[in-house]
Amino acid sequence: MIREERLLKVLRAPHVSEKASAAMEKNNTIVLKVAKDATKAEIKAAVQKLFEVEVEDVNTLLVKGKSKRHGQRVGRRSDWKKAYVTLKEGQNLDFIGGAE
């Protein structure tokens, strides 16, 4: 069993975009920013425990940080991990319910 403090550190924030909204409506999938070292099993356990929903599948990917210029200097944004969490049929999780 994964410790509760680790579960709280795994999930960072919901990722809100057009693609994420379409995935939620079409496939019942939520998109989350997660800790870079998080595993699929940890992400699944964290979502099930914190949001009390049943998870069917978890897909993850690493998003590479973009290079950004600040005048003459070139900086780089940090890499981060994105998780597509598919909920079981009949389950619902609404992050942006009243934001119309």
UniProtKB/Swiss-Prot annotation:
Entry-linked Pfam families: Ribosomal_L23
Keywords (A to Z) from UniProt: Ribonucleoprotein, Ribosomal protein, RNA-binding, rRNA-binding
GO cellular component, one term: ribonucleoprotein complex
GO molecular function annotations of the record: rRNA binding; structural constituent of ribosome
One BP annotation, GO: translation
Subunit: Part of the 50S ribosomal subunit. Contacts protein L29, and trigger factor when it is bound to the ribosome.
UniProt cross-references to PANTHER family, sorted A to Z: 60S RIBOSOMAL PROTEIN L23A
Role summary: One of the early assembly proteins it binds 23S rRNA. One of the proteins that surrounds the polypeptide exit tunnel on the outside of the ribosome. Forms the main docking site for trigger factor binding to the ribosome.
Family: Belongs to the universal ribosomal protein uL23 family.
Protein name: Large ribosomal subunit protein uL23
